[in-house]
Each structure stands twice: as structure tokens, then as C-alpha cells.
């Protein structure tokens, strides 16, 4: 049995724009928010978790989405010297049409985050997701979550931090997505 701590990334550019637009989903389709990054508010959220979450010192493994906002959140919570294991299956839903969910290439990620220990992502982002006829379905998300659950079975008696996104964590935790807070460690046993 593992202790899994699921953490949504800190507040990001696209979250702020969505709020300011009175919740207009067209924000997510704007290239202005491509590779959405943490805002000052998101940085503060991650620092507060770093300062106030005692369990962070007991984490054995950090699993993280390949999105910069998640990697930055992990580095703030656990320090820039922490070893991060990056998994493509932890990215946000939907992959496609939402530019804020576009990620850097494998080469860019490794260059920008030298503390990545392992990385399980294709070299290039799957551009076909940005074809309106091919973007990721809810069923694809469920398959990713199941793949991740199977992956977690390879660990035993570990404390694992999972840094991911609202929709992915909502599906994984079986919680309403609107209840998933930024930089809050939801603990489950798995």
C-alpha cells in the first residue's frame, strides 16, 4: 500500500485569464496562454505548501506532469535539487484545442529542468490533438488514469507525490473537478 499525495499545480496564467474573462472557455483556445506558467499567486501557493506541509519531507518519489506549471510547482514545493519523474499520462485533459495544455519537447524539458530523473514522454507533443476532429476524448482520459493506476502498482510502501492538473486529478480521485484546490495535498492510500 502506498500513500499518494495528489497536488494540483499552482495558479497559472490561464487560470487567471479564465477568471477575469468571467469563465469564458475561449481563453483556453488562445495561443496567448500556450504553455501557461505559474503566476505570482501560484508561486506563493507552492511556497506556502513548502512551508506548511510536514509530509513533504517523507516523500520517496515525485511523479509529475510534463507541463512547466507542474514542474515549477514541484521545484518550489520540494526544492530545485529534488528528483522528478515525469509522466506524459499526468498531463491535463483535454490534450488538444487548449493551448494552455501544450507542452515543451523532450529536449526542452530536459534542458530547462536538470533535476528530471526519469522522463516518459514522446519527444514531440502530439500535434494531431490540435485537430478539432482528433482531440482527446473523456474516454482517453479514463484510459490514461487507468494506465497511471497500473503504473502505481509497481511501487510498494512508498510515499508518492503526484503533481498534476484539475481534470486528471478529478478523474483519478473521483472528485468533482471544481473541488480540486491548487497546491493542496489530497492523500489517498493505493
Go through the PLM ranges and name each one.
Residues 10-13, 67-70, 90-92, 126, ...:
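Short, solvent-exposed loop/turn segments at secondary-structure junctions
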Residues 3-7, 63, 158-168:
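Beta-strand elements within well-structured catalytic alpha/beta cores of enzymes
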Residues 1-4, 16-17, 22, 92-115, ...:
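Acidic, low-complexity terminal tails and accessory targeting/binding regions
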Residues 42-46, 62, 109, 141-142, ...:
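Conserved anionic group-binding/transfer micro-motifs
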Residues 141-145, 149-153, 160-165:
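GST-like fold's C-terminal all-alpha helical module
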Residues 48-52, 112, 147-151:
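A generic secondary-structure signal
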Residues 13-37, 79-144:
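Phosphate-handling substructures
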Residues 2-86:
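Active-site-proximal alpha-helix that buttresses catalytic centers in soluble enzyme cores
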Amino acid at each position: 500500500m502506498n500513500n499518494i499525495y495528489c497536488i494540483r499545480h499552482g495558479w497559472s496564467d490561464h487560470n487567471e485569464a479564465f477568471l477575469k474573462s468571467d469563465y469564458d472557455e475561449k481563453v483556453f483556445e488562445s495561443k496567448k496562454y500556450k504553455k501557461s506558467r505559474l503566476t505570482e499567486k501560484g508561486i506563493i501557493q507552492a511556497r506556502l505548501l513548502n512551508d506548511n506541509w510536514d509530509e513533504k519531507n517523507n516523500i520517496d518519489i515525485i511523479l509529475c506532469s510534463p507541463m512547466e506549471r507542474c514542474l515549477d510547482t514541484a521545484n518550489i514545493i520540494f526544492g530545485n535539487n529534488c528528483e522528478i519523474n515525469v509522466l506524459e499520462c499526468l498531463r491535463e485533459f483535454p490534450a488538444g484545442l487548449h493551448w494552455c495544455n501544450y507542452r515543451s519537447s523532450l529536449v526542452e524539458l530536459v534542458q530547462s529542468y536538470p533535476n528530471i530523473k526519469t522522463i516518459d514522454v514522446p519527444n514531440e507533443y502530439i500535434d494531431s490533438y490540435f485537430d478539432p476532429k482528433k482531440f482527446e476524448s473523456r474516454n482517453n482520459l479514463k484510459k490514461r488514469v487507468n494506465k497511471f493506476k497500473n503504473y502505481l502498482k509497481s511501487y510498494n510502501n512508498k510515499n508518492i507525490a503526484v503533481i498534476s492538473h484539475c481534470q486528471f486529478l478529478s478523474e483519478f480521485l473521483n472528485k468533482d473537478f471544481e473541488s480540486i484546490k491548487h497546491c493542496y495535498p489530497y492523500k489517498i492510500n493505493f
